[in-house]
């Protein structure tokens, strides 16, 4: 099958781009083209040139991106103007970079910056332990952990900011605080009653109870002042036989 060449009556053996390029670059084809335009006249030749140019331009736009709908094509929606919403369910276009409405330092293209980045506020600081500074603890906060080897119910945990400068510590042995340990002995149990406790306090080991006779004497016998106390004597041999 033969194919007619461009602007001439020469038939080609193949309708391919390489064959047509080889034919159009030949000397016979160029001579035939010149004779063709001379025969049709200047006005008709200009109209033919314009129609060919427009067809090539339309084919070039369609071949560059055939999946993209050009504005004004059938079935294509025109882009919404700035400040007006688009189709239902479609996000409005972001303001261009540098136009009013865009924050200073915003990235181009309407991208959302990460928190803490340029154009966004920094991360909020974490809340302090135990509520705000100097205030009560926030609802739902856990109590602070107790110190190691600290008896429960004696000294409360200090506030978050520490004790005030004019805070006075109670003297040793006061109610609710253990007495100082005796040198050479381990930690002893507190003998002072706690706040609200009633009754006679229990003395430490080796000391008599309040109101009891001294060690070695029976109850009800109290020597007069100035008389030395006699230690309790063990029974003799004569008394053991009786």
UniProtKB/Swiss-Prot annotation:
<comment type="subunit">
    <text>U1 snRNP is composed of the 7 core Sm proteins B/B', D1, D2, D3, E, F and G that assemble in a heptameric protein ring on the Sm site of the small nuclear RNA to form the core snRNP, and at least 3 U1 snRNP-specific proteins U1-70K, U1-A and U1-C. U1-C interacts with U1 snRNA and the 5' splice-site region of the pre-mRNA.</text>
</comment>
<feature type="compositionally biased region" description="Pro residues">
    <location>
        <begin position="90"/>
        <end position="107"/>
    </location>
</feature>
<feature type="compositionally biased region" description="Pro residues">
    <location>
        <begin position="156"/>
        <end position="183"/>
    </location>
</feature>
<keyword id="KW-0687">Ribonucleoprotein</keyword>
<keyword id="KW-0694">RNA-binding</keyword>
<keyword id="KW-0479">Metal-binding</keyword>
<keyword id="KW-0862">Zinc</keyword>
<dbReference type="GO" id="GO:0071004">
    <property type="term" value="C:U2-type prespliceosome"/>
</dbReference>
<dbReference type="Pfam" id="PF06220">
    <property type="entry name" value="zf-U1"/>
</dbReference>
<protein>
    <recommendedName>
        <fullName>U1 small nuclear ribonucleoprotein C</fullName>
    </recommendedName>
</protein>
<dbReference type="GO" id="GO:0008270">
    <property type="term" value="F:zinc ion binding"/>
</dbReference>
<dbReference type="InterPro" id="IPR017340">
    <property type="entry name" value="U1_snRNP-C"/>
</dbReference>
<comment type="function">
    <text>Component of the spliceosomal U1 snRNP, which is essential for recognition of the pre-mRNA 5' splice-site and the subsequent assembly of the spliceosome. U1-C is directly involved in initial 5' splice-site recognition for both constitutive and regulated alternative splicing. The interaction with the 5' splice-site seems to precede base-pairing between the pre-mRNA and the U1 snRNA. Stimulates commitment or early (E) complex formation by stabilizing the base pairing of the 5' end of the U1 snRNA and the 5' splice-site region.</text>
</comment>
<feature type="compositionally biased region" description="Polar residues">
    <location>
        <begin position="231"/>
        <end position="242"/>
    </location>
</feature>
<dbReference type="GO" id="GO:0000243">
    <property type="term" value="C:commitment complex"/>
</dbReference>
<feature type="compositionally biased region" description="Pro residues">
    <location>
        <begin position="136"/>
        <end position="149"/>
    </location>
</feature>
<dbReference type="InterPro" id="IPR013085">
    <property type="entry name" value="U1-CZ_Znf_C2H2"/>
</dbReference>
<dbReference type="InterPro" id="IPR000690">
    <property type="entry name" value="Matrin/U1-C_Znf_C2H2"/>
</dbReference>
<keyword id="KW-0863">Zinc-finger</keyword>
<dbReference type="GO" id="GO:0000387">
    <property type="term" value="P:spliceosomal snRNP assembly"/>
</dbReference>
<keyword id="KW-0539">Nucleus</keyword>
<dbReference type="InterPro" id="IPR036236">
    <property type="entry name" value="Znf_C2H2_sf"/>
</dbReference>
<dbReference type="GO" id="GO:0030627">
    <property type="term" value="F:pre-mRNA 5'-splice site binding"/>
</dbReference>
<dbReference type="GO" id="GO:0003729">
    <property type="term" value="F:mRNA binding"/>
</dbReference>
<feature type="compositionally biased region" description="Pro residues">
    <location>
        <begin position="201"/>
        <end position="213"/>
    </location>
</feature>
<feature type="region of interest" description="Disordered">
    <location>
        <begin position="60"/>
        <end position="242"/>
    </location>
</feature>
<comment type="similarity">
    <text>Belongs to the U1 small nuclear ribonucleoprotein C family.</text>
</comment>
<dbReference type="GO" id="GO:0030619">
    <property type="term" value="F:U1 snRNA binding"/>
</dbReference>
<feature type="zinc finger region" description="Matrin-type; degenerate">
    <location>
        <begin position="3"/>
        <end position="35"/>
    </location>
</feature>
<dbReference type="GO" id="GO:0005685">
    <property type="term" value="C:U1 snRNP"/>
</dbReference>
<dbReference type="GO" id="GO:0000395">
    <property type="term" value="P:mRNA 5'-splice site recognition"/>
</dbReference>
